[in-house]
């Protein structure tokens, strides 16, 4: 569980980007999960030693999809649920390093943790 609590430093830091507020989030958990699924092997301490191009492309695509506050909050909820499903095999250190390893520039380092209140903390 401690490894999962480190989710904040995870991959998913990059989904928090500035954007205008709209009335309804257009982002679904299916979209979030499908974009991050290629990262699973890397994040679960398998034999994969780098995120790989499919993982990096998925992260870039997701980063470009979270345009509104509601989208970012929805992505936060989806990411927290997905990380719970991965379970204790999740490597938080690898997750935290994905933006750097993929060459993705993050404007700031908002962290998503299991105790993050996605509806109020993520703007």
Curated annotation (Swiss-Prot):
Instruction: Quote the SUPFAM superfamilies the UniProt record gives.
Output: Bifunctional inhibitor/lipid-transfer protein/seed storage 2S albumin
The answer to whether UniProt assigns keyword Signal to this entry is yes
InterPro entries attached here? Bifun_inhib/LTP/seed_sf, Bifunc_inhib/LTP/seed_store, Plant_nsLTP
Alphabetically sorted, this entry's keywords are: Disulfide bond, Lipid-binding, Signal, Transport
Q: Which biological process annotations from GO are given for this protein? A: lipid transport
**A Pfam family assignment:** Tryp_alpha_amyl
Domain of life of the organism encoding this protein: Eukaryota
Q: Which GO terms describe its molecular function?
A: lipid binding
Cystine links in this protein are 29-78, 39-55, 56-102, 76-118
* Stretch forming the signal peptide: 1-25
Coiled-coil features, chain-numbered ranges = none
Q: What does this protein do?
A: Plant non-specific lipid-transfer proteins transfer phospholipids as well as galactolipids across membranes. May play a role in wax or cutin deposition in the cell walls of expanding epidermal cells and certain secretory tissues.
The family this protein is said to belong to:
Belongs to the plant LTP family.
Protein name (record): Non-specific lipid-transfer protein 7
In its UniProt entry, the species of origin is given as Arabidopsis thaliana
């Amino acid at each position: 569980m401690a490894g999962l609590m480190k989710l904040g430093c995870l991959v998913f830091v990059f989904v928090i980007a500035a954007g205008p507020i709209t009335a309804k989030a257009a982002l679904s958990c299916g979209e979030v999960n499908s974009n991050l699924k290629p990262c699973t092997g890397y994040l679960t301490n398998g034999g994969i030693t780098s995120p790989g191009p499919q993982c990096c492309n998925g992260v870039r695509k997701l980063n470009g999809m979270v345009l509104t506050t509601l989208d970012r909050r929805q992505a936060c909820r989806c990411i927290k649920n997905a990380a719970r499903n991965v379970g204790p095999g999740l490597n938080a250190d690898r997750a935290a390093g994905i933006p750097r390893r993929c060459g993705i520039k993050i404007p700031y380092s908002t962290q998503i943790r299991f105790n993050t209140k996605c509806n109020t903390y993520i703007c």
